[in-house]
Amino acid sequence: MTTHFTKEAFDTFEIEGLEQRMDAIRERIQPVFKQIGQEVSPDLTVNLAEDMYVHIAQHARRKVNPPKDTWMAFSPNKRGYKKHPHFQVGLFDDHLFIWLAYIYELPNKSQYATKLLNHQELLHALPSDFVVSYDHMKKEAQQIDETGLEQGLVRFRDVKKAEFLVGRHVSAEEVSAMSHEDLVKLIRNTYEQLVPIYKKIQ
């Protein structure tokens, strides 16, 4: 069983058909998610002083269109993650994403946005390879210093469907060359940088 994301894992998103692609996700990607979950969730639990549970996306609502990406999440809620600030690891066909995510299902979204607006210095202090996104369904992300961060956070506050995600994107080529140990080290390092934001923005 593979314990890291191979080129084949990223090629999964070229497979036609919902069932065929889901079979490949279960075979090539989800075992790696499980392994990452076992290693990373105890770290987050310690660092956050609250239990963090692993959720692996099952794409159960899909009936026709195959998913363009897939992910796992770490959340303080055993039953779900979408209504809570949470940490994600996932793949599109060309990159890995490692996020702290505030998505549109989050209740009291405007309160989180206001706190982020009041603590933008936490975001500007992140390493230069960190990026932000305002829509988890889109591949694109922007460097934090280039974004008009305030404008994006205002939109996150005021627009119901707007989101805020911050973390790292790593190319498929780079990820597929990594060992399992290097991959987990990268995820841990990314989350270590994001934990202070998670704690502050409650």
From Swiss-Prot:
InterPro entries documented for this protein: UPF0637, UPF0637_domain_sf
Gene3D superfamilies attached to this UniProt entry: Protein of unknown function DUF1054 (3.30.930.20)
Superkingdom of this protein's organism: Bacteria
Disulfide bridge positions per record: none
Pfam families: DUF1054
UniProt similarity note: Belongs to the UPF0637 family.
Protein name (record): UPF0637 protein Exig_2520
Lineage: Bacteria, Bacillati, Bacillota, Bacilli, Bacillales
